[in-house]
Each structure stands twice: as structure tokens, then as C-alpha cells.
Amino acid sequence: MSIQTDDYRTKYTLETFSFLPEFTADEIYDQIVYIINQGWTPALEHEAPEAASSHYWGMWKLPMFGTRDPNAVLAEIDQCRAAYPNHMIRLIGYDNYTQCQGHNFCRFTVLGECNSHGTNNE
């Protein structure tokens, strides 16, 4: 008899969608369309997993002011991933009317246990 063991390492929970299953490519595209349809400005942030919960994340280029093409946002996500393959990447929709984030979710996350200082124990 074989006993199946799974990877029980903790998943980072950095936002509401962290508690749901990973988004499919179509669901990510739909989230980008939602951000654009709200009139919000898409932007990307990235950070190494060991520092993801301890300080602000670095921004990838400038926010994509005036971008109406979801494929352009996807292309930027791919470029950020190519430049920082081991970083977590978050997509943000900035609301310029209320001057705050209207929406955000992590596009790429990692598994790992974090201690109280936010560092990875792997």
C-alpha cells in the first residue's frame, strides 16, 4: 500500500485571492480586463519571497498609464518574470480618483514557510 504525501509547506497569503486556487490564464486575463474597464491604471510590483512581507515591493517600470490593451499588460508581466524569475509578482490597479489601489493580486507566488521575521526557512 502506498501512502501519498503532499507538499505541506505554507503558501504565502498576501491578498484575498491567495486563499483561492491559482488563477488560470483566462482568469488572469479577466482580472486585467476588469482593472482596465474600471478606468484604473495597471502596474506591476515584484519582490524576493524572503522579503515579501517585511517591506514595500519594488515597482516594475512605471505604471501603465492609459493602457487599454490587456495583452500589453500580459507582455509586461512576462518581461518582469523574465527579468526576475525567482520573485513574486503582483498586479495592481491604481484608482487615480480615490488615489489608492482599487485592486491587486499576486500573479506569481511561491511555497515556503516563513518565520516571524518574514524570511524563508528553505
Swiss-Prot record:
Induction (UniProt): Both mRNA and protein accumulate at 0.15% and 0.03% CO(2), but not at 15% or 2% CO(2) (at protein level).
Superkingdom per UniProt: Bacteria
Gene3D superfamilies found in the cross-reference section: Ribulose bisphosphate carboxylase, small subunit
Keyword Zinc: no
UniProt xrefs under Pfam families: RuBisCO_small
Quaternary structure (record): Heterohexadecamer of 8 large and 8 small subunits.
Note: The basic functional RuBisCO is composed of a large chain homodimer in a 'head-to-tail' conformation. In form I RuBisCO this homodimer is arranged in a barrel-like tetramer with the small subunits forming a tetrameric 'cap' on each end of the 'barrel'.
Protein name according to UniProt: Ribulose bisphosphate carboxylase small subunit 2
Source organism of the structure: Hydrogenovibrio marinus
